[in-house]
Amino acid sequence: MNDKRVVIVTGAGSGIGEATARLLGEGGHHVVVSGRRSEPLRRLERETGALAYPSDAGDPAAVDGLVRAALDAHGRLDGLVLNAGIGRGGTAGDLALGDWDDVMRTNLTGPMLLLRAALPHLVRARGAVVGVASVSALRNGVGNAPYATSKAALLQLCRSVAVDYGRQGVRANVVCPSWVRTEMADRRMARFAQEAELGQGGAESAYQQATALVPMGRPGEPREVAEAIGWLLSPAASFVNGAVLPVDGGVTAIDPGTVAFDFHITPRDGTGR
């Protein structure tokens, strides 16, 4: 973004949301950061000049208040980063209904509520929306039904905005990160390491195993996803609408059917051997 805009970033207390808020702040944009935890948001406020508005993404009154806070502070609203999210596991046959409800409330209903409150202002500003989904929206893992379903639905929610509001100047796109070093991912890796008895390597060993088939051979960093989000919000992406951008080190380019044959899984040297 090379002109100064007003952007709401949800789930900004850590990880991709925090990195995005910092990136936009460095560019001189006016950022309103939201999340459930107050202290990380207040720290961002002190360090970047963002406006902190702690709130529950699934509470309609809180979401309306978030949009009003942005308008009261800056008089306009140009962009949304729909990043707030939680993860819960389970299969369709054994998941806890409470987990399903929690995930859908935060990962899907929350973005819908924010879009509903913000769209009249985004239309006036000819603004942009970026949804932070996941590669789980494109391809699934074992025991991941609530999270994957919510992220696939978020993807289509954003595409609906692209279709329904494109003629009014609003763009909506989606990024789909793979494993990224965030607090949520760190917790999951620590749990994986414990369940797999990985020993002293702990979460780092789990990251290595989880990204073994990623062509770039590593997890992503929050800033790398933030850079993609910043571009999609910017005038440089003015004709990009309804797009789904994997930010995944190439993992969605792999054909799982060849993995068992190890055609290209072992890293090669610089000669291509």
Feature locations, PLM:
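Conserved glycine-rich cofactor-binding loop
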Residues: G13-G15
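Substrate-binding pocket helix/loop in short-chain dehydrogenase/reductase
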Residues: T91-A92, A96-M104, A210
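Active-site helix of classical SDR
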Residues: L115, S150, C158
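Alpha-helical segment proximal to the catalytic Tyr-Lys
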Residues: P120, V163-D164, S238
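Residue(s) in the substrate-gating loop at a strand-loop-helix junction
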Residues: S134
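Short, small/polar-rich loop/turn modules that mediate ligand/substrate recognition or access, typified
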Residues: G166, R171, V240-G242
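C-terminal helical subdomain
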Residues: V174, E197-A236, V240, G249, ...
